[in-house]
A protein has these predicted regions:
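Signature of N-terminal electron-transfer/Fe-S-associated modules in redox systems
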Residues: 1-175
Length: 175
């Protein structure tokens, strides 16, 4: 306090101290629609999507984001929604599995390829596979089997071979 007075500053009062800054909100776009999150900035994106927006396609798997179940596109890149806090999403464009279809209702080519190749087991991992596949096809339009096998997704139903065929079909490559 003496140091503040020596610098010509008025002494602090308890009314001058705030435990955390006032939050105006985190603006983001989810599946083409604008939203403002005014809650906890440390809330993981996964819980915002599922609990606030009621977009339940993105799943929780191992709670560490290592299994690919929770993948979403953030500014066009696949990221783990459980690892991404809302504070890191200001101005971001988020696409979930619910936002992959076109405005006219037609499916994304990878969604159609999953249907055509019967690449759906129980369906729990399917949203993550779709997001990871779209990210891969954006980076590598003609992915190899090895590229596809390196995706972080896990499946307990054993559809990996059909997923590989679906991704190659969507890429226009021969399975």
């Amino acid at each position: 306090m003496q140091q503040a007075q020596a610098q010509g500053l008025p002494p602090a009062t308890t009314g001058d101290i705030t435990p955390e800054p006032v939050r105006e909100g985190i603006d983001l776009i989810v599946n083409g629609e604008r939203f403002r999150h005014t809650g906890d900035p440390l809330m993981p994106l996964l819980w915002y999507l599922r609990d606030v927006l009621r977009l339940t396609g993105t799943k929780l798997g191992d709670a560490h984001g290592e299994d690919g179940y929770d993948l979403v596109l953030v500014n066009g890149k696949a990221v783990s929604a459980i690892k991404r806090p809302m504070a890191k999403l200001a101005g971001a464009r988020v696409t979930t599995v619910e936002g992959l279809a076109h405005a006219d209702g037609s499916l994304h080519p990878l969604q159609q390829a999953f249907i055509d190749e019967d690449a759906i087991g129980c369906g729990y991992c399917t949203p993550g596979w779709l997001i990871a596949g779209i990210d891969l096809l954006t980076r590598k339009p003609k992915p190899s089997d090895e590229d596809i096998d390196k995706l972080p997704n896990r499946c307990r139903c054993g559809v990996q071979t059909r997923v590989r065929r679906a991704i190659k079909r969507a890429a226009g490559a021969k399975a």
